C-alpha cells in the first residue's frame, strides 16, 4: 500500500524530466502500473533485486524503483533500497495532505481498483527449488488463470503467468529455504 501512496504522490506533485520510468520487480503489485499509466509514465518490470534497475537509477532514468518488500528508491535521492526514505516520504505525504495512510490508500483504490494481492511462503528443500527452476514454460501453454486465458509467461525469475486481469508468480527464494507464491487479481 505504501508504494502506491508514494508513487501517486510523486507523480501528482513533483516534476520529472520526460522519458523517466517507474521500475518494479516481478513480484510487486501491478497497481503501480495503473498509477503510472494515469500519468503516462512507462513501467519497467524487472527480476527481484535492486541491482536490476541500479543503472537506470544512477542515470536518473527512474522516478521510482521498488519491490514488494516496500523497499524503494526515488529519482535523484537514493541509488539503493531505502526504507527510511519511504517512511520520511509517507510522513511528508500525511503532513501535506492532512490525511492518514488508510485515507490515502482508500483514495488510491477508489481511483484505480481494489487489488487482491497475496504472498505465501512455502517451506521447501533445495531439490524442490531446483525443480521449479527447471519447469519449461512451453508446458504451461493453454492453461487458464482466473477464469481467463494466460496472455504471457515469464520465466526469468521463477514462473510468472499473466492473465487478462490477474497474475501468479512461483519463485524460489534466493536467500531462504522457501518457495514464494504471489498472486494478484
Q: Language-model features: where?
A:
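Cysteine protease catalytic core and zymogen-processing segment of caspase-like enzymes
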Residues: 1-11
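Phosphate-binding and adjacent anionic-ligand microenvironments
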Residues: 13, 17-184
